[in-house]
Regions:
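FAD cofactor-binding and catalytic pocket of flavoenzymes
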Residues: 1-98, 106, 146, 168, ...
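Active-site Gly/Thr loop motif
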Residues: 129-167
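Mobile, glycine/GP-rich and aromatic-enriched active-site lid/loop segments adjacent to catalytic centers
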Residues: 98-142
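Internal hydrophobic alpha-helix adjacent to the cofactor/substrate pocket in enzyme cavities
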Residues: 82, 119-129, 196-213
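A conserved FAD-binding loop/helix module that cradles the flavin
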Residues: 183-202
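Active-site-proximal substrate-binding core of FAD-dependent oxidoreductases
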Residues: 1-2, 133-142, 202-213
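Hydrophobic, well-ordered secondary-structure elements that form the walls
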Residues: 85, 119, 152, 177, ...
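Secondary-structure capping and boundary motifs in well-ordered enzyme cores
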Residues: 111, 144, 164-168, 189-193
């Protein structure tokens, strides 16, 4: 089962709030799923009371197949989700430390409920048995591709970067990672970061030639 015909990773694109019957009243935006199948450990299938040749025979058998779906949803941009500098608590160089004050809200909590319900329904209709939902503890930072803290915008008072990813008050500094985003979508943003970086680099070259940097 380590080679040949076997299941692989799967991706379910967003299907909520894209029009018509897909629209929901209890949350905005949407989510997608990433998932796949795998076999459990052979040792988990062997009873602890086994020993000797019987035990050796059991642990050579592959474990049961399992399929999972993990939901990835958009987090709306909330004004009170923010990063600030703590000037009362400095690091060893005397610089202010960073303080994060952010959490998911009612919109995301309602979305998580729907994620679980829909995943269970999909798997059961596909013929899987012993389907269980799981809603683990979540905190910002566990989604790998976190976004925000240096958002793009036109207003200097409400954003850090301009449309070219330049820091408003320090034009020779560009920020092109997830910090520039205003909200976290439900898809992998890596290609978007690459595009923003290429655009910012092109802009920087042009500005440098004009002696503006």
């Amino acid at each position: 089962y380590y080679f040949g015909r076997r299941n692989n990773g799967i991706y379910v694109p967003r299907f909520r709030n894209i029009g018509g019957k897909t629209n929901r009243k209890d949350f905005l935006r949407g989510y997608g799923y990433q998932g796949g199948g795998s076999r459990g450990s052979s040792t988990s299938e062997a009873a602890e009371i086994l020993y000797g040749s019987q035990f050796k025979e059991e642990i050579l058998k592959p474990g049961r197949w399992k399929v999972r779906l993990s939901g990835f949803g958009e987090i709306l941009p909330y004004q009170d989700n923010r990063m600030t500098l703590d000037f009362n608590k400095t690091d060893k160089w005397g610089l202010p430390t960073v303080t994060f004050n952010a959490s998911i809200k009612e919109n995301e909590l309602n979305m998580r409920k729907d994620m679980q319900q829909q995943a269970i329904e999909m798997l059961e209709k596909a013929g899987f048995t012993d389907v269980k939902g799981h809603d683990g503890d979540y905190a910002l930072g566990l989604g790998i591709h976190e976004m925000g803290t240096a958002r793009m915008g036109h207003n200097v008072k409400t954003s850090v970067l301009n449309r070219n990813n330049q820091v408003h008050e320090v034009p020779n500094v560009y920020v092109t990672d997830g910090s520039a985003m205003t909200s976290a979508g439900n898809v992998n943003p890596s290609l978007t970061y690459m595009a923003l970086t290429a655009r910012a680099a092109d802009h920087a070259v042009k500005e440098l030639k004009k002696m503006n940097l």
